[in-house]
């Protein structure tokens, strides 16, 4: 089907804004498309893409502090470890919970810091 591009442009130029909006809506419906903006890929020499927002965090015990008994109690409550395992973890440090949400990581950090421990979230 041949068409005259300039004739089509001239005909569309006579439409009002409301008529154009109706035309666009009709074409979207006919073609099954949305008005989403296409994101261009990075050009040559462009900076590296921004890092994705982190969704999983690790809670790391750095130091149990002076009140180890309270820290051990919190470790047992958070992890479900036995007394010996919680005591060993409090002495050597390391990962308490891995792959948890930011909210949970902040909650665990607050609990352990309240007991006197030094905790990091990575």
UniProtKB/Swiss-Prot annotation:
Gene name per UniProt: rplL
GO biological-process terms attached to the record: translation
Protein name as catalogued: Large ribosomal subunit protein bL12
Keywords noted in UniProt: Ribonucleoprotein, Ribosomal protein
SUPFAM superfamilies reported for this sequence: ClpS-like, Ribosomal protein L7/12, oligomerisation (N-terminal) domain
Role, per record: Forms part of the ribosomal stalk which helps the ribosome interact with GTP-bound translation factors. Is thus essential for accurate translation.
InterPro entries: Ribosomal_bL12, Ribosomal_bL12_C, Ribosomal_bL12_C/ClpS-like, Ribosomal_bL12_oligo, Ribosomal_bL12_oligo_N_sf
Source organism (scientific name): Deinococcus geothermalis (strain DSM 11300 / CIP 105573 / AG-3a)
Keyword hit for Ribosomal protein: yes
Annotated GO CC locations: cytosolic large ribosomal subunit
